[in-house]
Design a protein with these regions (language model features):
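Small-residue-centered hinge/linker elements
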Residues: 1-228, 233, 265-372, 378-392
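Extended, domain-scale alpha-helical bundle/helix-rich regions
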Residues: 236-240
Length: 392
């Protein structure tokens, strides 16, 4: 019995110590967050954006542990606010060197153009565009100066799409894949039923790549103040050295990262200038008055709850019918909410969950709250269905 009470007291003491340590950990996190916010009032600053890190379409609630992940939506918001912030003198970017989703690259480019309307500079440094597609370059092509490390290559060559087909594999095990498909262009199931592209599948893939390529060429040529033909000629004869890319007008300065960073510091005002990570940037003051609610959904549409970036245990992202419908209900009940922006980035998924979200959009409209759709990386199948009933 004595041993039992000793063990019980030890357990209680251990739990007590755990909660004490957890309490001080939370205080520490709050203090660090406060210091990050305080840094924003420390004079002249340059926003720093590292596109080499994974960039989500949008993030969920801010996580308790760890830094908030970069996202396209937060980048656009931060740059739009920073252009009106007198303490922010410019933007310094480290370019992505591996590849980006085309829609994300285009939205980041548009956010940079919006930021530049303030007259503030944008400088980008790359450690080589080697083995990458067009998207990392297009994302930063609107920069005032594009730097590249002189010992690296410029190997951007265009776009490609690869599909693995498993048709015939199931038959070896006396299994037959069965899917419901609506017409020949609904080709998601082809990877399990075919051994190669069908004519319709090949046509849709080529059409998508051609459309993306032409759009990217037009945007890059506008940013670099060159003809589309001249820009295409460079990419069609890739790979190139950094020196040749500079001669072609696609790179402005050859140099290392530290030199580019110090150049940005001098341009902003000298040694006292600090670099502020864009994920730590928060505008000063509070917004009062009417509210526009933001509801986001990314990943496959599923029944039940969403899995988002705020959950440290989530292994993938999903757009849950219950979670999204509940968010709409909250916005409908909130008298301060005048309108709803619904960010959709999904390839589709559960018909039942898609219909649940479609109904939530309809209920918001019936309550007199306009619903505006912002499409992210994709809005296919059920993703387009949930958006179709919106006001715009």
């Amino acid at each position: 019995m004595r041993q039992f009470f000793i063990s019980m007291l030890g357990t209680v003491f251990g739990i007590f110590v755990f909660f004490i340590l957890f309490f001080f950990l939370i205080i520490g996190i709050g203090t660090i967050a406060g210091l990050s916010a305080a840094d924003q009032s420390a004079g002249k600053q340059v926003l720093f954006m590292d596109l080499r890190q994974p960039v989500l379409d949008h993030t969920g609630a801010k996580p308790i542990f760890g830094a908030e992940s970069a996202s396209v939506v937060n980048i656009a918001r931060s740059l739009n606010r920073a252009k009106k912030d007198d303490s922010i003198k410019g933007l310094f970017i480290r370019a992505n060197e591996f590849g980006m989703v085309p829609a994300s690259a285009e939205e980041i480019r548009l956010a940079i153009l919006d930021f530049k309307e303030s007259g503030k500079f944008v400088i980008t440094h790359s450690q080589g565009f080697e083995g990458t597609t067009l998207t990392p370059y297009m994302a930063i092509s609107a920069s005032d100066e594009i730097w590249q490390q002189d010992t690296t290559g410029f190997a951007i060559a265009g776009l490609r799409s690869e599909t693995g087909f498993y048709g015939g594999v199931f038959e070896k095990y006396d299994a037959k894949p069965q899917f419901e498909q609506f017409h020949e262009y609904k080709n998601a199931a082809n990877v399990y039923t075919q051994t190669d592209y069908t004519d319709a599948h090949r046509e849709s893939t080529n059409s998508l790549l051609t459309s993306l390529y032409d759009s990217m060429m037009a945007q890059i040529s506008t940013d670099r103040k060159q003809s589309t033909e001249a820009v295409k000629a460079v990419f069609d004869t890739s790979p190139h050295s950094a020196e040749d890319a500079k001669k072609a007008g696609l790179i402005d300065v050859l140099g290392h990262y530290n030199a580019a960073r110090e150049h940005a510091r001098e341009k902003a005002g000298g040694k006292s200038v600090k670099f502020l990570p864009i994920t730590n940037y928060a505008p000063k003051g509070y917004v009062t008055g009417p509210v526009i609610a933001f509801i986001g959904g990314q990943g496959p549409v599923v029944t039940g709850e969403s899995a988002d970036s705020s959950n440290p245990f989530a292994t993938s992202l999903s757009m849950g019918g219950d979670s999204v419908a509940h968010a709409f209900d909250m916005a409908i009940k909130d008298k301060k909410v005048e309108a709803i922006v619904f960010r959709v980035s999904t390839p589709g998924g559960s018909p039942a969950a898609s219909d649940q979200i479609h109904d939530a959009v309809a209920r918001a409209k019936e309550a007199g709250k306009p619903v505006i759709i912002s499409m992210g990386q994709y809005a296919a199948s059920g993703g387009y269905y949930v958006a179709a009933n919106a006001d715009k």
